[in-house]
């Protein structure tokens, strides 16, 4: 692992990337649902990345609406997860609307058939949308309970042959511990899949990390809450952590 010595610089370019956006990213200063200002800022960042020539696929979470695995009262796990999948579709449609208002053509593809509101996810169809210059927003995880949207992000990134998976978080990379709770936390510019898993650093779940590792797809962790951070990370600038072998 490489300890950070400042902002990363470089001319790294990706032709096709996947961005994982957690449901919490939509909340902003609110406790629940959507903060319109946050959705607008995120959409502007996505548009800038798209207009720089990068094909963009997005997997959204649903934690701003329903926290499936952590909400057990009155629900069994399978029902929890299906409700959570529906929450991701709500987020995907909201993001699609914001992007289209900015003139960005995009499609929502759901792993659960919902033909009245969006297309059903088919890999070839999703790839074709990317090739036509559309942003693809994947919803409903992988369509099965017991799998997180992090795992869905890894799977979709691999299926669609993305050059990298970008994980938007609330901090500017991977730290040795939570920097919001531990002032001595060390930030890494680079860390291996093995070190990440063995250190039990909770960036993504183990299944997602293992999928990326087995298919040699790097994961880039950055601060999605900072304006322009996604554009910078895609182009090899700014603060981020690269997870790879």
UniProtKB/Swiss-Prot annotation:
Record pathway: Pyrimidine metabolism; CTP biosynthesis via de novo pathway; UDP from UMP (UMPK route): step 1/1
Name of the protein in its database record: Uridylate kinase
Cited SUPFAM superfamilies: Carbamate kinase-like
E.C. number(s) listed in UniProt: 2.7.4.22
GO CC, one annotated term: cytoplasm
Coiled coil: none
Reaction equations catalysed: UMP + ATP = UDP + ADP
Species, as recorded: Anaplasma marginale (strain St. Maries)
Family from the record: Belongs to the UMP kinase family.
Record lineage: Bacteria, Pseudomonadati, Pseudomonadota, Alphaproteobacteria, Rickettsiales
A Gene Ontology molecular function term of the record: UMP kinase activity
Biological role stated in the UniProt entry: Catalyzes the reversible phosphorylation of UMP to UDP.
Residues that bind ATP: 20-23, 63, 67, 169-170, 175, 178
Subunit architecture: Homohexamer.
UniProt entry tagged with the keyword Nucleotide-binding: yes
Known regulation of activity: Inhibited by UTP.
Keywords: ATP-binding, Cytoplasm, Kinase, Nucleotide-binding, Pyrimidine biosynthesis, Transferase
Annotated UMP binding sites: 62, 81, 142-149
UniProt main location, coarse: cytoplasm
One Gene Ontology biological process: UDP biosynthetic process
Localization in the cell: Cytoplasm
